[in-house]
Amino acid sequence: MGFNPQGQGNGPNYDAPREMQDLPAGQAYHFRESDETAAARVSPVSNPYEPDYDQLSPPPPLGAQRPVPEQNESSRDLLHSSYQGSVGHNSFDGHSFGHNSYGPGAFGHYPADQHGRMPGSPGYEYPEPEYDVEASRLAESRLSVMHRAPTMQDWGQNGEALSVPDFAHGRPDSTYQEFDVDESWMMRQQQNQLAGGLGRSKTRKVKLVQGSVLSIDYPVPSAIKNAVEPRYRSGPGSMEEEFTKMRYTAATCDPNDFTLRNGFNLRPKMYNRHTELLIAITYYNEDKVLLARTLHGTMQNIRDIVNLKRSKFWNKGGPAWQKIVVCLVFDGIDKVDKNVFDVLATVGIYQDGVLKKDVNGKETVAHIFEYTSQVSVTPDQQLVRPDPDKPHRNLPPVQFIFCLKQKNSKKINSHRWLFNAFGRILNPEVAILIDAGTKPGPRALLSLWEGFYNDRDLGGACGEIHVMLGKGGKMLLNPLVAVQNFEYKISNVLDKPLESAFGYVSVLPGAFSAYRFRAIMGRPLEQYFHGDHTLSKSLGKKGIDGMNIFKKNMFLAEDRILCFELVAKASQKWHLSYIKASKGETDVPEGAAEFIGQRRRWLNGSFAMSLYSLMHFGRMYGSGHNLIRLFFLHIQFVYNLVNVLFSWFSLAAFYLTTTIIMKLVGTPQVLSEYHGWPFGDTATPIVNVLIKYIYIAFLVLQFVLALGNRPKGAQYTYVLSFMVFGLIQLYLLVLTGYLVYRAFTGTPIEEQISFESGKAFFDSFFGGDTGVAGLIIIALFTIYGLNYIASFLYLDPWHMFHSFPQYLVLMSTYINILMVYAFNNWHDVSWGTKGSDTAEALPSAMIVKDEKGKEAVVEEIEQEQEDIDSKFEKVVWRALAPMSEMAEEKPEKKDVEDSYKSFRTGLVILWLLCNIVLIVVVTTDDFITLGVSKAADVRTPTYFRVLLYSTAVLSIVRFFGFLWFIGRTGIMCCIARR
């Protein structure tokens, strides 16, 4: 690849090329004229890995080919450019590019200079452009799958659509065909060590900080640093090195020891910047599309903040972008989808070949990269770079910290790196937590921050998470997605507003939440980090190894622990809130096996944490909350207690509801002249008995499956179970509708509801002797009516039409399948870490003495800028390539202790025993011999009255909490500071 001939190398006087290459191809990249020509250009220095990249063609991705997106005046395919005249050190012949194919004149048309020399000729003097990236658009370009070298007719001019159907033959190739993604990535980590780049690299000696901390600055590719707009590069508070050099630090310590005293530091602190907002993106094994969705959405949100015009805060004390830091924390090298590294390298916050597995024999715990970038990649594998013609639409510079943990040590450990390591150095006011795959909506992060800015007692907050439904809502055709969509929506409409009104939101989803940093410091984080297995030895009995199975299940819902500890913090009055204006989008499980596996963790963790918060409610008295807040917290305590009891007996409740309604509708009643419905007096009872036994058989099957099978190993059986329980529930809904119709038509309505007096009217609904119409009206209004009313008041009612019906059909599966599986796998808590086989392939950093024999230094290969740019070319091709299908992840073998299984067995027995006792008490007459005077036909209606009245009360409480939240939100919008 070409570079500025006036400033070769990467020294302090390096003069980078003024024009950014049109990524990912075009003049910016070289294409071999033929195999013979390409072979002639191979470096004489032997490299066992490099030839593979130059000789093999990448395989076409699995699945359908992605089309090249349509272009308009604001979106230009980066594969296109104006190709007039020579385009680099080697001229373009209409069919191929030379090895060095871009220079200052490669990305736009330059006229002849004053001496008559043409662009690309020796001695040509390039004019100084107005912007470093000439004529660049806010380009969101996607690399399509191509299989031949382009001709001049293929390329077109600026902004034209590319007509080449195939394009890979003739471009620099990779090892993808011979090696899988992981092997290719491991090879790239050794290239610098084995071959010294392209054979022209030198070595440099890097001094260690305090003799032990390895921190090195690496030049970034020319394309990335030239993408930065001049107004930012030379703006107030900007530092040249943050745009031209990527900083790498090999942290060989525990997060608690990552301190200034021990020689560790971060660029925002080094530049003496105040960090107002620390945005953390936690990653496990998501693909590059999911990561790009989160990363690009975050950068768009930062643009929303930077572009604020009337803000009293962000426009003072320096540029807004310098007050924001984005931190990516990856949980272990082994689990990472290696394609993700190419996306990060394209942005500029990662480079191959710089990772060090140890420093002088001391194992690296985390690899930390720092860079400030103005480049982004969209989920559609399109590249976004600045457009000088539309600066308000450009993404601002973003300060990135990329923490790649060497071993997989779970999410809590990732948060320990975030809060204890980076947080203590940066000392942010607000920390926002986002899971990879969650896309923050427009101004979502700004809305979260404004909640803290306008409420000094707000300790934590969350926004609305909604389900990704696909184009035109096509994913709603999957009933599991529709059910989860309704669940998310109704939680945002009723549950979160109610808890926000009380001041204690039981769970701020880790996928999209925010905390005031000084609020969670101290005991909240201390208790939270007890779940970090890397601290198990130092914590002893307080650590994860010393916990019983109940507490270990609590840490399956680790975000709930942080919420409770924050509200109950001694002598403090922090409260939690839900912020309606902040919205995030996430994907949900689409298959039965994935859905069951996810809910096992959620149900067990939330149930254990609910019991913990109820048992430790007394800690609220030691907090600094006033009497009014404590009063409402007591109401919430009762509300949560009732919900826990309902959950515990829900297995029996669904069975009783199913069997009793079938009995009421299907059994002929001669005195009342009611016939069996819907199949007649003879067939209906038989059908109902068959359905009853099918219900019991499939319920027993769930226990068998849960005790002996993984969901993925029995996914077809689980799909059948969902279908069976769904059909039974649908049949039950039809019978319920008929029962309601019969209640209103069998006895005149005026005889059931009296308007003679207030007492008579009250008795019509709660007296129990004047008919069931009043009770049915209460049930219909509170269970269905309030949901519709609240959704319309929330201005988001559509889920009640396209998702509510599916939820009604499948709601019994939440108990009969999900809860049964969760309780039967209560023992399934795995906390162990796996060693990193991938990390073993990384090079080491060996400490030597300097020439004077005094200071400790590390010898590091120093690559030429041309080599960096050449490798970057291949990185972008990989990053923007359509994503191939991923192989199914292999399950980990788990060693479960017998004590955990014993506890699980006891829990399941107790749960079943309680539910069986409830069923027997309600439905059998055998208790008459024990002195119980009322028969089953009397106890059954009483049970249903209590159940319906309790449900109605809970629904009314939720609705009033919703009304209070809506009113308060409307008022705050009028008086909030910006």
Swiss-Prot record:
GO cellular component terms, A-Z: cell septum; plasma membrane
UniProt xrefs under CDD domains: Chitin_synth_C
Catalytic activities: [(1->4)-N-acetyl-beta-D-glucosaminyl](n) + UDP-N-acetyl-alpha-D-glucosamine = [(1->4)-N-acetyl-beta-D-glucosaminyl](n+1) + UDP + H(+)
Domain of life from the UniProt record: Eukaryota
Biological processes annotated in GO: cell wall organization; chitin biosynthetic process
Family of the protein in this entry: Belongs to the chitin synthase family. Class III subfamily.
Protein name: Chitin synthase 3
